[in-house]
A protein has these predicted regions:
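Aspartate-rich (DDxxD/NDxxD/DxxxD) Mg2+/diphosphate-binding motifs
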Residues: 1-32
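Histidine-centered, transition-metal-coordinating active-site segments
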Residues: 12, 28-34, 38-203
């Protein structure tokens, strides 16, 4: 349920919707906050604080080499954190998972889309996977998933944190940067965003 608040067109749609929402309300639209809103306010499923916190703090856009859970005491503190994020979206960077499961969820979010976006870009004929530089985590989706998971297990098993080693973390950051330059900022993608996604969000 962590991405249940995502609008159409993933993060691109989210950015355009955020601009419109902020212009009209003074608050921000962020998919992780919307996921919490859906599961806690719109449909009150009586979900635990730890689960809602994991959903709010799952955003893989903010990668770390080590994830230490930080205890969250009550719903009042949690609601205050969420409201602060609506007012200033930079506060999302302060959200930290309160459990190891939440930490796993956050790093898994990055692992899930890093190679999959490359796979999708190749299917859409935007570019070939061999356009990427070889690195410690590989270049193909299956390689990236396997190499990162194995490294995280090796560095985290039996520990009170979730961690990958420095080599794999640097490779992850490089791969993510390559995705931005080669996929998300690609002229074809930008043109479709400008001509299709933005007008649809305005409707």
């Amino acid at each position: 349920g962590h991405d249940i608040g995502h609008p159409a067109f993933a993060h691109t749609g989210e950015r355009h919707l955020d601009k419109l929402y902020h212009k009209n309300t003074g608050k921000h639209f962020l998919h992780n906050l919307q996921s919490v809103r859906v599961l806690d306010k719109i449909f009150p499923y009586n979900i635990s604080l730890q689960t809602l916190n994991g959903i709010a703090a799952h955003d893989g856009e903010m990668e770390l080499s080590e994830y230490y859970p930080q205890r969250l005491d009550d719903f009042d503190d949690f609601d205050k954190q969420i409201e602060e994020c609506y007012i200033d979206k930079r506060n999302v960077r302060k959200l930290v998972p309160g459990t190891l499961e939440g930490c796993v969820m956050r790093i898994s979010d990055i692992i899930a889309y890093l190679g999959k976006d490359r796979q999708d870009a190749e299917k859409a004929s935007i570019l070939k996977t061999d356009a990427y530089e070889e690195c410690a985590i590989g270049t193909y989706n299956a390689e990236i998933i396997n190499n990162l998971i194995v490294n995280i297990i090796e560095n985290s098993y039996g520990k009170p944190y979730i961690k990958m080693d420095a080599e794999h973390f640097e490779a992850l950051k490089k791969a993510k940067s390559d995705n931005y330059e080669l996929i998300y900022k690609n002229d074809i993608v930008k043109a479709e965003t400008h001509n299709i996604v933005r007008p649809m969000m305005r409707q």
